[in-house]
Amino acid sequence: MSLFGNTTTGGGGLFGNTTTPTQTTGGGLFGNTTTGGGLFGNTATPTTGGGGLFGNTATPTLTTGGGGGLFGNTTAPTTGGGGLFGNTPTQTTGGGLFGNTATGGGGLFGNTQQQQQQQQQQQQQQQQQQQQQPSTSLFSQSSLGSQSSLGSQSSLGSQSSLGSQSSLGSFGQTQQPQTSSLFGNLQQQQQLQQPQRSIIEQKLYDFMQSISPNSLNCRFLYWFYNYQANGQLVDPNSIPKPPNVTVDQWAYALSNNPDPSILIPVAAKSFDDLINRRMKQEETIIALDQNTQEALKRMRDLENHLNFHIHTQLEMMRKKQIELIQRYIEVWSNLEIYQSKGKTFTTSEERIMKKIYELFEEINQPNSIKSKVEEISNQLKLGSMEKEKIKYEISPEAVEPLYNLLKNMTISIERITNELEIAVKDAQILKNELYQLKKC
């Protein structure tokens, strides 16, 4: 085998071995090799063919059986011949670099096909042989389905990846006239995935809109009603609609307003709105509590002020009244003395005189009412001190009637004391008058 020549006998080389002697005709730089299986494939019978720089013509020869090469095998009769720019084979099947084809072998840039009917018959034979005797390649599997090509569609009568009509497949074997490609399948898958993605994206968008407080389609919506500040009346038509609610929702809120004259609808569409509303209510409650405490403080101050001034004024009025009574008694006594001057005592006057003396003696006696009152008060004080020592537990139901009793007793004692003081004063006045009468 020479660089530009032909080989006359079969031998083992880098690209294959032959099992029987072969004869070749013609050979150039890109000519023919004899036959044989090697790195790229094996054949069981001799083949003939020749190749020149720009192509050759070959006579049909038959091969039997199929062998597996690194990238493919031949399964049908072939006539090998290929030039640099092409040749005219007749019904051949040959192994390409990346796969097997059902029709003639190819040159580097393309081949011409002949006899479409015979090609179809050979294709059917190849399909049957592939079913019975499948061949394998490094980058593809043999099947009855469609095969893929690197960036192009490979089939009978279709364009290859190099832009020429050939039966060379890439990474696979073609047995049926179906057109498919690696990128075509990806495009089909992407086209199928695009509707699915759009549906999922639409569902996600709808879900986000249903929970977004700024969306009109938010499902979380509840209406609260706030009081108008400063107690002013509200005009429902002058209330602006919030931007994140629809017209129907706003109309529903206005229609369900319990008192449109003082209440304003407020929409709550999220937990943040509820939290803000709760914080505002707490602030309002704190402000109301502060106002209440201030009002109570002012009321206490006013009560203390009134009690102090009224009590002092009442005491002053009582003192004035007592002075007036004393003056009146003094005037009346002087008048009576002047009128009764030189007259004798009557029986009634004598009785009054006796009563006055008796009252005066009772007051000064140790068993008088005054002493009894002091004794009772001392006993109460001692009883309270003993209670503090013993620490008896008295129920509120028992304390209340005792308190009322003591209160009534204290009031009665004060009244008796006042009456006694008045009686003592009257007795003193009478005593003075009697003393003056005696002088006269």
UniProtKB/Swiss-Prot annotation:
Keywords: mRNA transport, Nuclear pore complex, Nucleus, Protein transport, Repeat, Translocation, Transport. Residues 25-40, 93-109 have a biased composition (Gly residues). Sequence repeats lie at residues 4-5, 15-16, 30-31, 40-41, 54-55, 71-72, 85-86, 98-99, 109-110, 171-172, 183-184. Pfam families: Nucleoporin_FG, Nup54. The keyword Ligase does not apply. Coiled coil: none annotated. Its main location: nucleus. Residues 1-188 are annotated as: Disordered. It is found in: Nucleus, Nuclear pore complex. One of its GO terms (molecular function) is structural constituent of nuclear pore. One of its GO terms (cellular component) is nuclear pore central transport channel. InterPro entries: Nucleoporin_FG_rpt, Nup54/Nup57/Nup44, Nup54_alpha-helical_dom. It comes from the Eukaryota. Residues 4-184 are annotated as: 11 X 2 AA repeats of F-G. One of its GO terms (biological process) is mRNA transport. Residues 110-176 have a biased composition (Low complexity). Contains FG repeats. Belongs to the NUP54 family. Probable component of the nuclear pore complex, a complex required for the trafficking across the nuclear membrane. This is Nuclear pore complex protein nup54.
